[in-house]
Amino acid sequence: MYNYLDFEKPVADLDVQILELKKIAQEKGSLDMSDEIARLEMRSQTALRDLYKKLSPWQKTQVARHPDRPHFMDYSAQLLRDVTPLAGDRKFAEDEAIQAGFARFKGEAIAYIGQEKGHDTQTRLRYNFGSARPEGYRKAVRIMELADRFGLPLLTFVDTAGAYPGVSAEERGQAEAIAQSTAATLRLRVPVVSVIIGEGGSGGAIAIAAANKVYMLEHSIYSVISPEGAASILWRDPARAKDAATNMQITAQDLYRLKIIDGIIPEPLGGAHRQKEAAIEAAGDGIAAALKSMIGKDGETIKQERWDKYLQIGRSLA
């Protein structure tokens, strides 16, 4: 059984009926219930399709945060080969919320940076729920500089509610670390492709997403602040997160229309968590196409195109 979201209750009810019928058919081998099961399965798929055709921004936020949604380590396992992770920022400590290193993607050498949230209590604590500390962003800068030195394309996978806001992180220069990471991305003379695979929250996401090509999965979100944070500021009530999400234009569809991102990667029906391998494969195809579009361009051209991209975004939204 899936972990159903609250708005998926009609689908959940049908799926429960399907499981009950399958159990009865198994217990009473002489009873043929295949036609009834097939009918209910068709109704379930239709209900799911109808739901996902008209998701609200808040519902998309829930899908982006689904506990079973594939995270960076899932993408790494399926898309990357010969992975050589690097650890530490050479200044303070290692931060596992940001995974980084070198690997091969479809046979080509690349550098990678990915934000990992974890899948269970143990791994979520290990990765700090995907909220990186300053040393994580300084490690990211270290990888960026190595990628630039060796002429390796950089792939980044964004999935964070935001950078860690704790006192210790602020004492070690969280804002400066985020700013330096963003600036370092813009300086690179190698192709940079970023995919927002779940949440793209605030500066914690932007720090590794100032790429030549930025893609979002169909049901991911990308914003300067979480809906709960915006609701707390605007209405002093985090319970109004649904209202905030509706007005913030945080969905992939909104951001593609505003020309903030370069494309939307389709997800399987019902979200990436229902067919993880298919969702990851689609993301890999999008990354490959983005890299192919930059083949033959020299470093200065790649860098200038990145600068021009973000200057144009600033002008168009001013």
Curated annotation (Swiss-Prot):
Residues 43-293 form the CoA carboxyltransferase C-terminal domain. Pathway: Lipid metabolism; malonyl-CoA biosynthesis; malonyl-CoA from acetyl-CoA: step 1/1. It is an enzyme of class 2 (transferase). One of its GO terms (molecular function) is ATP binding. Gene3D superfamilies: 2-enoyl-CoA Hydratase, Chain A, domain 1. Acetyl-CoA carboxylase is a heterohexamer composed of biotin carboxyl carrier protein (AccB), biotin carboxylase (AccC) and two subunits each of ACCase subunit alpha (AccA) and ACCase subunit beta (AccD). This is Acetyl-coenzyme A carboxylase carboxyl transferase subunit alpha. The gene is accA.
